[in-house]
């Protein structure tokens, strides 16, 4: 699994993923910063990135139109880079060896706990 980190999140999340044994890129490192959300989708699709963002609403709308996608991780609260790293580490721990195809993982704080939830997206109509 490889991750593409959105420009709304800190570049240090790349190192968090790499330290956990994953391949990761940041939108800014690929000179994709400033592109519209829909302009990132072909890159995500072609390179089979699991996308990591804080911009859940916009990307859920885009991914909801995709019949197949490699997954999306949403860091729900808008927090400092230190807390982004903590939440992303929790998401990586949750994922483990799971296949995230057509899945969303949301990670957030609930009180003093970190909570990860995973669901199919778009929902299967079968």
Predicted regions and their residues:
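N-terminal first-folded block
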Residues: 2-50
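Charged phosphate-binding loop/patch that engages nucleotide di/tri-phosphates or the phosphate backbone
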Residues: 95-126
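Mid-chain, well-packed structural core segment of small domains
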Residues: 59-92
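A short acidic, often aromatic-flanked loop/helix-cap motif at beta-alpha or helix-coil junctions
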Residues: 32-34, 79-82, 112-113
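Structural signal for conserved beta-strand scaffold positions within catalytic alpha/beta enzyme cores
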Residues: 26, 73-76, 106
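Acidic, metal-binding active-site segment of PIN/NYN-like and related structure-specific nucleases
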Residues: 45-62
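Short, surface-exposed amphipathic charged segments that create phosphate/polyanion-binding patches used
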Residues: 40-42, 84-93, 120-121
């Amino acid at each position: 699994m490889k991750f593409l980190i959105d420009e709304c999140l800190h570049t240090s999340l790349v190192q968090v993923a790499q330290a956990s044994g994953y391949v990761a890129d940041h939108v800014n490192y690929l000179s994709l910063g400033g592109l519209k959300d829909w302009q990132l989708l072909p890159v995500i699709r072609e390179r089979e990135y699991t996308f990591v963002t804080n911009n859940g609403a916009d990307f859920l709308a885009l991914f909801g139109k995709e019949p197949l996608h490699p997954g999306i991780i949403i860091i729900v609260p808008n927090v400092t880079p230190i807390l982004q790293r903590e939440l992303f580490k929790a998401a990586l721990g949750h994922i483990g060896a799971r296949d995230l195809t057509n899945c969303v993982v949301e990670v957030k704080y609930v009180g003093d706990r970190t909570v990860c939830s995973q669901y199919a997206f778009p929902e299967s109509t079968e």
